[in-house]
Design a protein with these regions (language model features):
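N-terminal alpha-helical modules
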Residues: 1-159
Length: 159
């Protein structure tokens, strides 16, 4: 199906180039995380054959993977990093870098953990969602949830 649809073929070629660029930046990873993640992504992409809308499923899978690699390996310019101090505690900080990928991405860091988030529709402000983390910014303040079932942190952008 990918070879038969020009849009999907173009996304496949773009991902190939982005993946090559990421491998150049990931040369010192031990174990080689990028290669293992790519194999996992291919398995998930192949699950689109079970989808009722295969083309849309495949297109979304490619766009998300391209955006993930571009942000994670800093293949596109980022805006930031911006520091957010949470709950009035100087030691409780989240560092956010925004990437104008398609879809837009945010990499947030808190302590030793990192979350890769996607832009989500929001009635007001800017909202990103990761696996178990969320970041919702409005007028220089952010409501950040870090971890499954965790209470939200009330954060302000540091000057």
């Amino acid at each position: 199906m990918i070879c038969d649809a020009e849009e999907l073929s173009a996304l496949d070629r773009k991902l190939s180039g982005v993946y090559r660029a990421a491998t150049k930046k990931a040369t010192n990873q031990h174990p080689p995380v990028l290669k293992a993640e790519q194999r996992g992504w291919i398995k998930r992409r192949n699950e689109c054959r079970k989808s009722g809308d295969k083309r849309n499923c495949l297109s979304g899978a490619y766009l998300r993977r391209i955006a993930e690699l571009q942000a994670r390996y800093r293949l596109v310019p980022g805006k930031g990093p911006f520091r957010y101090r949470c709950d009035g505690n100087l030691a409780n900080e989240v560092v956010a870098t925004f990437f104008q990928t398609d879809p837009p991405r945010l990499i947030a860091e808190r302590g030793d953990s990192v979350s890769l988030m996607y832009l989500q529709p929001s009635g007001s402000g800017t909202k990103y969602q990761g696996r178990n983390e969320s970041f919702w910014e409005h007028h220089g303040e952010a409501l950040i949830t870090w971890g499954y079932g965790a209470a939200p942190l009330h954060c302000k952008k540091a000057q």
